[in-house]
Regions:
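Short, conserved "active-site rim" segments that organize catalytic pockets and cofactor/ligand binding
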Residues: 8-32, 50
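Glycine-rich phosphate- or other oxyanion-binding loops that anchor nucleotides, phosphorylated ligands
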Residues: 8-11, 35-246
Length: 246
């Protein structure tokens, strides 16, 4: 385990890709009270809050392995998974944010339902706090189930099938795997995912456009939304993070 100060509330912010987490350091530098430590964590002594971050790679296996490693090293009080997702609800628009309440793997289908992985829902009090903070930040947020699978969802037909069977608000490739490991380790978990596309027949085109913007040095503000929401909520409701394990 690292030398993280357990007198602080420990928030772990994780992502699949570096670009989904790059904004964290820039954002904390512009906020009062934050200092970077020699362990590359971020501490706010007044708030008694510490943030650790980790990029674990794309897909469920990378997410599960990275989450287990993170928990063993840092013993966080709460894990927030930020990054992109495909929006599944009809009112969704690019840049809106999904606030996860519960998580399901759509490509895991054992014959007996009691063999399904055990995944705890996100703490309701923190989901509500994130929803309130989203409103204050003028971020359009939706709370609900997030579906996960080891594939890029870019088919309207497949999207509709997932909606019919699981009723999620968003689809990604990691959240349910992180949730499964966090549940096994008794660590509360929430996913905050910004809609990069609508997970339909136009999704591949949108992904290529985002990639081009990034490679040509253009900022993509929608990547910043989950980090702003996570940090602001943690600062405002730091006591809730400590209470999630009580």
């Amino acid at each position: 385990m690292s030398d993280i100060n357990k007198k602080n509330a420990i928030l772990a912010i994780v992502s699949a890709l570096p670009e989904e987490l790059n904004f964290l350091e820039e954002y904390l530098q512009d906020r009062d009270g934050w200092k970077k430590t020699k362990e590359n964590t971020y501490v706010n002594a007044k708030q008694r809050l510490e943030i650790v971050s980790k990029v674990f790679g794309v897909g469920k296996v990378s997410a599960a392995y990275g989450t287990a490693d993170l928990i063993n090293e840092n013993d966080p009080d709460l894990i927030i998974n930020v990054g992109y997702a495909g929006g599944l609800i009809k009112e969704a628009a690019k840049g809106d944010v999904a606030i996860g309440t519960d998580y399901v793997q759509v490509d895991f289908a054992p014959y007996f339902k009691n063999n399904l992985p055990q995944t705890a829902p996100s703490p309701g009090v923190l989901v509500d706090a994130l929803e309130k903070e989203a409103s204050k930040l003028n971020i359009t947020g939706y709370k609900g189930r997030i579906a996960t699978g080891d594939f890029f969802l870019h088919s309207t037909d497949q999207k509709n099938k997932i909606l019919e069977e699981y009723s999620p608000i968003a689809f990604d490739m990691e959240s349910a795997a992180v949730a499964q490991v966090a549940t096994a380790k008794n660590v509360p978990f929430i996913a905050l995912r910004t809609f990069s596309d609508l997970a339909d027949d136009t999704a591949a085109e949108q992904a290529l456009a985002n990639k081009h913007d990034r490679e040509t040095g253009q900022r993509i503000p929608i990547e910043h939304q989950p980090i702003k929401l996570a940090v602001n909520t943690a600062e405002r409701y730091v006591d809730l993070i400590k209470r999630t394990l009580s």
